[in-house]
């Protein structure tokens, strides 16, 4: 049998699952640099896939433990937007099916924007139910951000099309009769919370990008309402908007100093 071309070897490696495969052993003996580079790349991909699988299994332990108790509708809950000076706080509640699998799923803050958008679409397609809660800057100023976040989370749960049997919440306790588990850094420890963080993050980012079109001088589409130098300079130059949180420093001080 003649040697495979580089193109043929590349296509062959896509079919090979393990190094024990006879075809892989043949390629391994091929000393051509191009073939050895393909093998190195294949091994890296396999290693990454295995690491992602192990991470996903580790992040599924809360859900798996609840399913062993006969609980099926488990809602992961997370928020985005507690810290910004402008825009709403957005929360999401997500119920995933038992067979759900997206390798690489993680806390939304650790993912690129492109990856978040990709996962957002996949979660939307595969989830049993998704609920979103949005609380405006005006209500945040009335209630304080902690209480507003709680309200948004309860709204997200209420907006689910299926009633959850258990809540997995990122570092919060909610005033509800539904059994719940609060998990510190839950968006990196639970697939349901991670999925919720992605839904909330993409939802809020899209809202802030729209706000950026309405008020281009503020650059909302870049900083998403956080207190960057550009944002603070825009507030000084153009003033405070309805979308700003008036009880947050330094906006609170800016308003006070102008009175």
UniProtKB/Swiss-Prot annotation:
GO terms for cellular component: cytoplasm; ribonuclease H2 complex. Its cofactor is Mn(2+); Mg(2+). GO terms for molecular function: manganese ion binding; RNA binding; RNA-DNA hybrid ribonuclease activity. GO terms for biological process: DNA replication, removal of RNA primer; mismatch repair. Keywords: Cytoplasm, Endonuclease, Hydrolase, Manganese, Metal-binding, Nuclease. PROSITE patterns: RNASE_H_2. It is an enzyme of class 3 (hydrolase). InterPro entries: RNase_HII (IPR022898), RNase_HII/HIII (IPR001352), RNase_HII/HIII_dom (IPR024567), RNaseH-like_sf (IPR012337), RNaseH_sf (IPR036397). It comes from the Bacteria. It is found in: Cytoplasm. It catalyses: Endonucleolytic cleavage to 5'-phosphomonoester. Manganese or magnesium. Binds 1 divalent metal ion per monomer in the absence of substrate. May bind a second metal ion after substrate binding. Its EC number is 3.1.26.4. Pfam families: RNase_HII. Its main location: cytoplasm. A divalent metal cation binds at residues 78-79, 170. Endonuclease that specifically degrades the RNA of RNA-DNA hybrids. This is Ribonuclease HII. It comes from Bacillus cytotoxicus (strain DSM 22905 / CIP 110041 / 391-98 / NVH 391-98). The lineage of its organism: Bacteria, Bacillati, Bacillota, Bacilli, Bacillales.
């Amino acid at each position: 049998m003649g040697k495979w071309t580089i193109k043929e070897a590349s296509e062959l490696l896509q079919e090979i699952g393990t190094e024990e495969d006879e075809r892989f052993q043949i390629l391994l003996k091929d000393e051509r640099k191009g073939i050895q580079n393909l093998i190195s790349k294949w091994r890296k991909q396999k290693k990454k896939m295995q690491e992602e699988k192990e991470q996903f299994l580790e992040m599924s332990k809360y859900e798996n433990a609840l399913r062993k108790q006969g609980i099926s509708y488990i809602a992961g809950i997370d928020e985005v937007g507690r810290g910004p000076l402008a825009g709403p706080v957005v929360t999401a509640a997500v119920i995933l099916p038992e067979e759900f699998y997206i390798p690489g799923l993680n806390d939304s803050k650790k993912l690129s924007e492109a990856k978040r958008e990709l996962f957002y679409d996949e979660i939307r397609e595969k989830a049993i139910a998704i609920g979103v809660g949005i609380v405006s800057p005006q209500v945040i100023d009335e209630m304080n951000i902690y209480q507003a976040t709680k309200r948004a989370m309860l709204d997200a749960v209420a907006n689910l099309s299926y009633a959850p049997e258990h809540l997995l919440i990122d570092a919060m306790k909610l005033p509800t009769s539904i059994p719940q588990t609060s998990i510190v850094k839950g968006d990196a420890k639970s697939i349901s919370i991670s999925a919720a963080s992605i839904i909330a993050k993409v939802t809020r980012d899209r809202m802030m990008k729209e706000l950026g079109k309405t008020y281009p001088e503020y650059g909302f589409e870049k900083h998403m309402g956080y207190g960057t130098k550009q944002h603070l300079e825009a507030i000084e130059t153009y003033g405070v908007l309805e979308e700003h949180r008036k009880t947050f420093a330094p906006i609170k001080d800016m308003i006070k100093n102008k009175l």
